[in-house]
Every structure is written in structure tokens, then in C-alpha cells.
């Protein structure tokens, strides 16, 4: 066990991150597609608790994000928690704030600790976009004469702006037009995301984050262990530049290559109060210093991080000049580019290990995943303060400020 933090560095109600884990991110219908979102969630929670050296029996509450809940069964967060060995007596709540669900879960967990309601809480998010069903909306009334309409549950509940009746990618095009961000700039950013992600993978920086996942390959055949983000292995810069626009045929700039990919994955964080960290002698990786939400018109969600981030930094009692690294979820390359422009960010300090364009974007997972990755960036680059933000459908965004506390590896030395 790592040495305990000194009592002069923590206040009793400080929110401390003592364990983190994420699964590798699997491609759509790819390496993790045989596992449900709740199973992926269980794997991440179990690993985070093990790395934190926290007995599951000590957990008081679980907040876990999940967006595409159809066909998962009742209370997905509870399924994930019980599957990780957390007792029946623990309260579990599933959070759906679209793409920000995982981060909002961490924010709610933090509030419960700050208010003195809890001392040990697990938070995070999960998604298996590969397993989202398609709907027969008229079947309940009876399927009579004629053809039936099949509705894609993933599009309907995850990727569609219900207010304007168009796909999320159209919002990316609106953003690109408004801020005059070209196709070439978006492609260059996407290539950079892949290059940074591949570099982090090749230098084992993601090993600190990832819990390997064992996947069955069928009866009588040995299982395989997935320990790398699947999307990074399919990078082809030349092909990326030739892809056609996906959402705007004439003059469009958002493509499948410079947008995030449909993916599967889960991420979890173990949060404890400063008082409990001292009592149990836990290794504190980071403190949560502040957080905030923001919202504007639904079709403008792409730039809402630029509203949420300053609010979170102010609530943390910091100045933007003190922030070492940022993570802004790459729903589309244009999202990172627009918010970088609006906030005047140094490109070298934004998404330093790649992002959703290269790694993938499992909706309910991503808000938690970027927090785990931000901690990895701060650890690798010896930063102190980091800010993560993620936009969400409907016009919103969430942001959270972390203070990195230690350069020591959490959990086992293998990490």
C-alpha cells in the first residue's frame, strides 16, 4: 500500500480520487461486442476498487452513466455494481446526461461527499453501442397489414437532435461554418489525434488506465485478452483524407474519419472524502477541485464546453493560467478545434494522448474516460491542474477540474 497522504494536504470533505480504471475501447461490432454495457461496467468498477485497495463492502453509493439503456434490463448501474461485488445494501443510480453522463456521475458523487452524505462512492460510465437494439414502435398496437418501420435505437436515443430533427453531425457542420473551420483543419486534427493516441499506446502510457478484458471466442476455443484500444489499429491517414462528408453532401466537412467512432467501453473512479482517505491510509491520486455545467441552444452543443470550463475553473478557485492540461471530448474534430479557439488554448496542452476521434466514443462512458485519461496525462507530463469537459446532446456540457496529488503509480507495480 502506498504511504498515506499527510493531514496538512487534505481537508475532511475534500473529494479524493483513489482508484481509476477503464476498459479498452472496442470498435462497433468489434472486440468487446459480445459483452453488455453492464458487464463492461462491472469490469471497470472491480478494477478501480482493486487498484484503490478499497473493499467493495465499504462503498456507500454508486452513480454510473449509461445512455442507451434499451434491452439492458432494470437499473443498469445496479447491475454493474452488483456484478463488481458491491453489496446489495449499496444505493445505485443510473445517470443519463447523454455524452456527459459519465462526468455528471462523478459530479453527483462528489457532491454527496462534499455534503457529508457519503465517504466512499464509485462513479463512472458504460456503453455498448454494439448491442443497442432496433425498435418496432408500432408493434405494441398490433402489427397489421403492410410493412413495419424499424427504428435504430442508437440513432433515436443517442445520436439524433430531437429538437431540430437531424443528426448530431449536422451540429458539427453548423459549428464548422460558424467558426470557419475547414475540412483540411479537421482532417489534420484527426490525424494528430490518432498519432497522439498511437504514441501513448506504444509507450505503454495507456496501461496505467486500462484493465485488460477477457473475451470468449466460442465453445471449445481459448478466450482472448483485449488490452488495447481497437480503433488505433485501423489508422490510415491517406484514406481518412479521401472520405466523403457524412452529414452535408454539398460543401460538408465532417466525415467518419474526423468524427468520433461508435464504440464500446466503460470507465470507473473511486472517490473518497479526505477524512476517509486519512483514516484508511489510502493513496490519493488527485482531488476534485471544482465542476460546472452549462447549456445553450441544442444545435450549438458543440461549443458549450467553452461556457462550462471557465465556470468550473472559477469554482475551483483557480485562474486559467494555472491549468496545465485540458481534455475536451472529441465528439467531432471541430468540437476540439472550436473550443480551443474560443478559449485560446495551447494545442500542445489539449488532448495530449489523443481523444475520441482516435480512441472511440462510447456515449455513457466518455465523460468518465476523459477524466481517467486526463489523470494519465498529468501523471506522465508532471502536471498539477487539469480540466476535462464534454459536450452533450440538447445543448449542454459538463466540466471538471482535477488537482493531481502524486506521481506514484496506483495499485499494482505492473501498472
From Swiss-Prot:
Enzyme Commission number(s) from the entry: 2.3.1.9
Cellular-component GO terms for this entry: peroxisome
Swiss-Prot/TrEMBL keywords: Acyltransferase, Cytoplasm, Metal-binding, Peroxisome, Potassium, Transferase
Primary localisation category: cytoplasm
Catalytic residues identified in the record: 99, 361, 391
InterPro entries: Thiolase (IPR002155), Thiolase-like (IPR016039), Thiolase_AS (IPR020610), Thiolase_C (IPR020617), Thiolase_CS (IPR020613), Thiolase_N (IPR020616)
A molecular function GO annotation: metal ion binding
Chain residues that bind K(+): 256, 357
Broad class of enzyme this protein falls into: transferase
Binding-site positions, CoA: 239, 260
Disulfide bond annotation, renumbered to this chain: none
Family recorded in the similarity comment: Belongs to the thiolase-like superfamily. Thiolase family.
Name the record gives this protein: Acetyl-CoA acetyltransferase 1
Organism from which the protein derives: Arabidopsis thaliana
